[in-house]
Design a protein with these regions (language model features):
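Cytoplasmic-side transmembrane-helix entry/capping segments in multi-pass membrane proteins
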Residues: 41, 105-108
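Membrane-embedded helix bundles of polyisoprenyl
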Residues: 43-51, 111-115, 183-193
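Basic, ligand-binding patches in group-transfer machinery
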Residues: 102
Length: 193
């Protein structure tokens, strides 16, 4: 894989925009199904639908022509989602100030928020374990280089790649290699809230 053409923090920003675009896509699907729009459900539904569609397309090599446009569209949807979300949230920041002061006074809440913040910061770091480097990054890099699925004998555990690796391929295609890690940490934090 080629050297990054920009600072690694830009890759983290791209990953956050792709995740935001996935949330917006999931919210639109939920709206069409007349369901309540939850951030966690929208993120999960958007990730599964996008990844499953790309996984099916990858079996016939169609995915490799639509991968980059899909990643760019998700990034632009994420920028739109964040822009519209910030227009709603910023005026409410003054009312949140009192709630934040109450949370700071309770040590259990303060400790849990500190742990969540640390977990998010940890997800921004590069992966170091063999499973992430060999398998979760290896399959997306192999897909992008060879435009086909690797044989199962190439990987540490002989596992077949799934929709998680397809979603990581979206991130790796735009140099947002921490997309899967940030998705996992946000999901754990949203489940705990």
């Amino acid at each position: 894989m080629a050297a990054l053409p920009f600072h690694p923090l830009l890759g983290i920003l791209i990953a956050i925009l792709i995740l935001s675009g996935t949330i917006l896509f999931g919210q639109e699907v939920l709206k069409r199904l007349d369901q309540k729009k939850s951030v966690l459900v929208s993120l999960a539904l958007g990730m599964v639908l996008i990844s499953q569609a790309l996984y099916i397309c990858s079996l016939d090599k169609i995915m490799f022509t639509i991968l980059y446009p899909t990643a760019w569209c998700l990034m632009l949807l994420g920028a739109w989602y964040n822009f519209s979300y910030l227009r709603i949230v910023v005026p409410k920041c003054y009312t949140w100030r009192n709630g934040i002061l109450n949370i700071i006074q309770d040590p259990v809440y303060s400790f849990s928020i500190l742990l969540m913040f640390g977990f998010i910061l940890l997800s921004f770091s590069p992966p170091t374990n063999a499973d992430a480097l060999n398998y979760h990054w290896g399959i997306p890099v192999y897909l992008l280089r060879n435009h086909e699925w690797p044989s199962t004998g190439l990987w540490l555990h002989g596992s077949l790649g799934g929709i998680g690796e397809i979603y990581n391929t979206l991130g790796v295609s735009l140099y947002a290699e921490n997309l899967g890690t940030i998705l996992q940490s946000l999901s754990l934090i949203l489940f705990s809230c």
